[in-house]
Amino acid sequence: MRSPRMRVCAKSVLLSHWLFLAYVLMVCCKLMSASSQHLRGHAGHHQIKQGTCEVVAVHRCCNKNRIEERSQTVKCSCFPGQVAGTTRAQPSCVEASIVIQKWWCHMNPCLEGEDCKVLPDYSGWSCSSGNKVKTTKVTR
């Protein structure tokens, strides 16, 4: 038969084991949380090679006239004197003067074989080939 003192000692050992296990679990959770935040931070904020752009979000929908509307968010790292633009239907760095003066077709935004025309209000451009027309409006 165990003495009351042994039962107290066994309970304190058991309690200390549980406390130690809880401490180890807490440390592991903190380490895992910190490492996942570190990885997420790098995934969302990685560096882009200078002079290039990448698409970070794409949105696509149809309006009530059954015309498809697309928009995208682009992240660029351009050289001095350059800004985000479009070349051959892809995001790119272009000379800032093209955008400032709204000479959109000077950045060659259309695909090979398409004709570029600046919109009458200078808010963007259209690329056409045959009866197909793609219109791009610039927003900031």
Curated annotation (Swiss-Prot):
The keyword Transmembrane helix does not apply. One of its GO terms (molecular function) is receptor ligand activity. The keyword Secreted applies. Pfam families: TAFA (PF12020). One of its GO terms (cellular component) is glutamatergic synapse. It comes from the Eukaryota. Residues 1-35 form the signal peptide. InterPro entries: Chemokine-like_TAFA, TAFA_chemokine-like. One of its GO terms (biological process) is macrophage chemotaxis. Expressed in brain. Expressed in LPS-stimulated monocytes and macrophages, especially in polarized M1. Keywords: Secreted, Signal. It is found in: Secreted. PANTHER family: CHEMOKINE-LIKE PROTEIN TAFA FAMILY MEMBER, CHEMOKINE-LIKE PROTEIN TAFA-4. Modulates injury-induced and chemical pain hypersensitivity. Ligand of FPR1, can chemoattract macrophages, promote phagocytosis and increase ROS release. Belongs to the TAFA family. This is Chemokine-like protein TAFA-4. The lineage of its organism: Eukaryota, Metazoa, Chordata, Craniata, Vertebrata. The gene is TAFA4.
